[in-house]
Amino acid sequence: MNLLFRLAVFLSLWCCSDAQGQTKEESTEEVKIEVLHRPENCSKTSRKGDLLNAHYDGYLAKDGSKFYCSRTQDEGHPKWFVLGVGHVIKGLDIAMMDMCPGEKRKVIIPPSFAYGKEGYAEGKIPPNATLMFEIELYAVTKGPRSIETFKQIDTDNDRQLSKAEIELYLQKDFEKDANPRDKSYQKAVLEDIFKKNDHNGDGFISPKEYNVHQHDEL
C-alpha cells in the first residue's frame, strides 16, 4: 500500500473547502459513527493531515439508494486523499478521524456536513439529504505533501520537477510496494500526475504548480 500513498503527493493536490450548504446554525448536527470492525492490533490511527487509502460506498439515508461506489471508479483502486483538509465532504473528514488500518465503519452524515440545501450530482443527491457511507480504511500514512518532499524529488535542484525525476521517485516506491505494478501502470500514473499538475504544459511541475489546489467533491 505504501506506493499508493506516495502517489498522492501529486494526485491529491486539489482545493480545500467545506461542504456546500453548511452554516453555523446547522453545525450542531452530528455525524453518527458505527464501528463495524476494528482490528485488535492498531498502532496508528488517522488524524488530520494524514494520507488515507480507502474504499467507501455512499447511500441516501432516506431510501437506501446508492449514489456512489469508489470500487467502480479508477479500475477499482481505493481512493487516495488527505484527511481533514476538504479533499472529501466535511462529514467524511469527521467520520474517518481516529480510524485504524483495516477498520470498517458505517456513518450517517447530516446535510450540513454533506451537500446542504444545494444537493449534488444532477439530482442524485437531493437538497437537504442525509447520507450514509460504508467505509473501509486500508492504511494510514503521514501526509507527504511538503517542501521537503519536493526537494527530495528535485534531484538536480533546479526548482522544477521533470518527468524523469518523478519517474525515478515513483520507481523507487514501486520497488518498495508489496504489490508491484507493471510498467504500463507506472506510465499511466506519470501521465496523470502531469495532466493534473502541469498547468502551463511546459513538461515540468514548478513549486507553485506543486502547491496549486484543485477541487474534487467525493
From Swiss-Prot:
Chain ranges for the short sequence motif Prevents secretion from ER as given in the UniProt record: 215-218
Disulfide-linked positions: none
Domain PPIase FKBP-type: 49-141
Processing and modification events after translation: Glycosylated.
Expression by tissue: Expressed at highest levels in heart, lung and testis. Weakly expressed in kidney and lymph node. Little or no expression detected in brain, thymus, spleen and liver.
Catalytic activity: [protein]-peptidylproline (omega=180) = [protein]-peptidylproline (omega=0)
Residues annotated to bind Ca(2+) 2: 198, 200, 202, 209
InterPro entries, per database record: EF-hand-dom_pair (IPR011992), EF_Hand_1_Ca_BS (IPR018247), EF_hand_dom (IPR002048), PPIase_dom_sf (IPR046357), PPIase_FKBP (IPR052273), PPIase_FKBP_dom (IPR001179)
Entry EC no(s): 5.2.1.8
A cellular component term, taken from the record's GO annotations: endoplasmic reticulum
Pfam families assigned: EF-hand_7, FKBP_C
Protein location: Endoplasmic reticulum lumen
Record: residues binding Ca(2+) 1: 154, 156, 158, 160, 165
GO molecular function, a single term: peptidyl-prolyl cis-trans isomerase activity
Note: Binds calcium.
UniProt-recorded name of the protein: Peptidyl-prolyl cis-trans isomerase FKBP7
